[in-house]
Amino acid sequence: RNLTHNYADPRWILQPSCGETLTQIAKAGLGLDMVSVMSEHSRAIVELADAHPDLKIVVDHMAKPDVSAKAWDEWAADMAELATRPTVYVKHSGLNTASGQGWTSRDWQPYVDHCLEHFGSQRVMLGSDWPVSLLAGDYVGVWQAQLETIAQLSPSEQDDVCFKTAQRFYQLDLS
């Protein structure tokens, strides 16, 4: 997992010195997790996907929208743009730490719905963000809230989001 937000340059992964490593990750069929906590990170992921069209990328924490401030426009545009790249996926995780005190699944629903609308259930996966998630909730409460946000999906779509998307992305053999 790449912690992009720990670097001063949000485009650092686009440096030529990273190119060969990214090519090898793609050749091995592996995926790259990217943390995006601001629009500049999301735009860099778009560039990364364009530069390495065979590289599977998952954007952790739905690019960390500021749920507590009900921030929407820039985040929604970034996610819609990311979704146009077929090798970019999104992880439904970490929203509780972006939601302030007293959050509920209703606070997250528009963000989840937007990602499902643009990425589809086959490119959205659940994640725990444990132990960081404990900063703004308990494990069971966060997990239950995440499941509530996908309750409207068909059983097949829920299977995608709950495990099949991650199984495909990370090449997990569950047999």
Protein language model annotation of sequence segments:
Residues 10-15, 38-53, 68-81, 102-113, ...:
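Distinct, well-ordered alpha-helical segments
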Residues 1-40, 47, 70, 89-95, ...:
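Active-site gating/metal-coordination segments in enzymes
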Residues 113-114, 118-125, 134-175:
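Mid-to-C-terminal alpha-helical segments outside catalytic/metal-binding sites
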Residues 25, 61, 90, 129, ...:
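Conserved, mostly hydrophobic/aromatic
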Residues 66, 97-100, 134:
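Short, solvent-exposed loop/turn segments at secondary-structure junctions
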Residues 37, 63, 95-96, 131:
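Catalytic metal-binding/acid-base residues of hydrolase active sites
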Residues 26-32, 53-56, 84-91, 120-124:
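Short, well-ordered coil/turn segments that N-cap beta-strands
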Residues 1, 58-60, 91-93, 123-128:
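Active-site neighborhood of phospho(di)ester-bond hydrolases with catalytic His/Asp-centered motifs
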